[in-house]
């Protein structure tokens, strides 16, 4: 419990780790398909953006350089999120068509805690093989369904071709100090069955049947009754998409959201693509961004080099637009396209900085 319970304090961050894992799986699969060991320091990509450029066709690894049609197509090719359940605590199903895992490897990957299997792969984000379990703290009774199959594109007969599955659950503390989380096994092994197409994917335009399209490999993870929070559970996922874009300013692939809640409103599209904050800034440049921004800068701390960019919203931008872009966040600390820390925009109101008059627009 201490490992799972102490990972993430906010449900949005725990959900992001699932999306990060999907991106890692996609890139890892592409590298292996090219006949390269992901841990090979001479042949494998050394950065995430390099891998995106070489294997996903993303120019310089910048999602915003793709056309809207190509962003949507790339998202559909890689995976997405299906939203079902009710409006209070939606159920999120995260799926991808990446590397996938054989049943025997579940304990050290999809169900693993503090493993080191990713630490030697330079182009992935999730290094510690435990972030995926952080979401369990925000799931009703800790119930999560995991389905995975090793991709035939990377399975060299070293692994089982079966589909593995398990269910996690939270158990009360009882006489223990803390509750425990367990995952389902049979006779000490993750249950499995011979590979067959499973109708567990959404179909574009089909709002009546949430899961009707065949899935064959990769990963499918369903978080039941997820406590995402009042501000992010609205129908059509507009607020959630905006918030995710601040945390994932340049995701490995655009995240496709499929709204399939029966109680959701019909005022907005049931499908949405989240391409990250940098894409939104580029798309809205003519309307809301000061013409000469971003301003680039660089500095060094203890021989470590850092770079940054400063974006300024124009004076006609109102509070609703501020919230859509960055809310109260004034500084984002980014590693591999993911925000790892934030500073509130109140930092610009300090006397020694003296930017109070535009503090909400930086």
Provide a role label for each language-model segment:
Residues 6, 80-88:
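A short acidic-Thr-Gly-centered motif at the start of a beta-strand
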Residues 1-78, 104-111:
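Bergerat-fold GHKL ATPase/HATPase_c domain
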